[in-house]
Design a protein with these regions (language model features):
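Flexible, glycine-rich terminal cap/loop adjacent to redox cofactors
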Residues: 13-142
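Flexible, acidic loop-helix segments that line cofactor/substrate-binding pockets
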Residues: 1-17
Length: 142
């Protein structure tokens, strides 16, 4: 089968590690490709905290309004291993919704991928329902 060079990952084994697959923001800008950015900070990620490596981030570029992954950059502890789930998803045309739906073992570094996907989902919640939900939960708690 043909090699899809858009999904060939790379990693730099520094401290912290840097791993990437697909487009970076700079690539997308240079190619005039529209994108949205979702960023998940690893500062409060349980496994990273347990290992004393709670620094770094996962940055995911997606098509505007869609969960299609255009590129991922991970800076952090074992980034070269953590990125493989995104490589698999991009290779098989799966988006962030699929990653969000996967049950991950707790606490693992790979679980951060799910948190990044969930961050994407939470940024796209329908805002029109929030005032109603706030009133409902205020009533429910009283």
């Amino acid at each position: 089968s043909k090699v899809n060079y858009n999904v060939v990952p790379w990693a730099t084994f520094t401290d912290p590690e840097v791993a990437r697959v697909g487009l970076s923001e700079q690539d997308a800008k240079e190619q005039n490709i529209a994108y949205e950015v979702t960023r998940y900070q690893l500062d409060h990620h349980d496994r990273s905290l347990t290992d004393g490596e709670a620094h770094g981030f996962i940055k995911v570029l997606t098509q505007p309004g869609k969960d299609k992954i255009l590129g991922v950059t991970i800076v952090g502890y074992h980034a070269g291993e953590v990125i493989t789930e995104f490589v698999f998803a991009m290779t098989h045309g799966m988006g962030l919704k699929k990653i969000s739906a996967v049950t991950h073992i707790y606490p693992t570094l790979g679980e951060a991928n799910k948190f990044a996907a969930n961050a994407w989902r939470s940024e796209r919640l329908p805002q029109k329902y929030f005032p109603w939900l706030e009133r409902f939960f205020a009533w429910y708690r009283s």
